[in-house]
Structure formats: C-alpha cells, structure tokens
C-alpha cells in the first residue's frame, strides 16, 4: 500500500531469445541451438505461440562460424556479427524475421534485439529493411553511449527504438529524452 499497491492483475510476457531455439527444439537436441535457417525461426515462433505467447524477441544477427572471416571470428568471439554487414548477412537477417512474421501472422508482436552489435549505418539499413514486418520495437541496434548515433538511426528508419540496459544514470538518458529519440526504455 505504501508504494501504491497492485496496479495490474496480469502482466504480458514475451518469448525471449528465440534465436537459441525453443522448448521442443531444445528437447530434441538436448541443448541450446543457435538457429541459422529461416525455417527454424518459423518453427520456434509456432512453438512459442502454441504455448500461449503473442509476442517474441529475436536477435537475427548471427552467422555460422565457417562463414565468418577468421579475423572477424577472433575479434567477435564467435557467431555474432559486429559492425558492418555484408549484403547476404542483411538478407539472411531479414529472412529470419520474415519467417517469424509468416509464422505468427498479424497478431504476433515481434521485438528485434540486436545486443548493440551493429554500427549506426548498418543498424539503420537493417531497420529500413525490417519496416514491412511490423516490428513492435528495435532494441539496442547499436551502443547507446552516444545518443547522437541513435538519432541517426531514428532519422533513417521508422521502427520504434528501444534501449536502457546499457544506460545507467539520468545523464545516460538525458540526451535521449531531449532528442525524443527513444520510443521504449
């Protein structure tokens, strides 16, 4: 009662980090599996929805190690793509989200999580490419330590932008608020 009491009888949850599979896929392989094929994204979204989820969070920015140049693999410690995308990386990421949208239809909300891996121009290009898929929000497409970079992305793509887990003080958020760059914190 002191802090206002209960305000919501229910809270919405989303199925998170589907790029690592979902229950049926994990049980089948007995481990987390990083998904590369868009068909697998279709399947895991269907599985999550069968469990009652109407929103999912996906990071589509991964590539098999054998496709990464060795210098890039050493610099990124694995499958994550950092910085600039090659054209086929962009296409593959969009295909994964397209498969999720196809699986979920218009009633599914899709959150695209990038874990701050991309540079500003690549994040803007990917955001533009994802616009037709009705993305709920585009989370941390690049590092939030320079709010001007988020402003650059916001000016170039129409997706709602989100950040917050890597900004820690009111000063870390101040410029975002002043520029009205963020849609979700």
Predicted feature locations:
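Active-site phosphate/pyrophosphate- and oxyanion-stabilizing loops and adjacent acidic/basic residues
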Residues: 98, 151, 174
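A ubiquitous, low-specificity "background" feature that marks scattered single residues
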Residues: 65, 145-146
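Active-site alpha/beta core segments
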Residues: 151, 157-159
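Catalytic beta/alpha-barrel core
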Residues: 57-59, 84-90, 111-116, 134-144, ...
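Short, structured coil segments at secondary-structure junctions
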Residues: 156-157, 180-181
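N-terminal capping/lid subdomain adjacent to the active-site entrance of alpha/beta enzymes
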Residues: 1-109, 117, 124, 128-132, ...
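Catalytic cores of alpha/beta
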Residues: 118-128, 148, 168-180
């Amino acid at each position: 009662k002191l802090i206002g009491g209960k305000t919501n009888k229910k809270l919405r949850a989303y199925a998170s980090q589907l790029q690592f599979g979902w229950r049926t896929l994990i049980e089948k392989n007995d481990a987390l599996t990083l998904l590369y094929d868009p068909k697998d994204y279709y399947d895991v979204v269907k599985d999550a929805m069968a469990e009652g989820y109407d929103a999912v969070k996906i990071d589509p920015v991964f590539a098999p190690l054998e496709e990464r140049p060795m210098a890039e693999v050493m610099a990124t410690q694995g499958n994550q793509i950092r910085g600039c995308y090659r054209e086929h990386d962009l296409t593959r990421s969009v295909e994964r989200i397209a498969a999720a949208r196809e699986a979920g239809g218009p009633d599914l909300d899709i959150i695209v999580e990038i874990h701050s891996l991309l540079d500003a121009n690549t994040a803007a290009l990917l955001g533009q490419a994802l616009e037709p898929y009705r993305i709920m929000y585009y989370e941390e497409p690049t590092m939030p330590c320079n709010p001007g970079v988020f402003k650059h992305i916001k000016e170039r793509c129409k997706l709602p932008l989100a950040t917050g887990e890597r900004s820690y003080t009111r000063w870390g958020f101040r410029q975002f608020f002043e520029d009205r760059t963020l849609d979700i914190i």
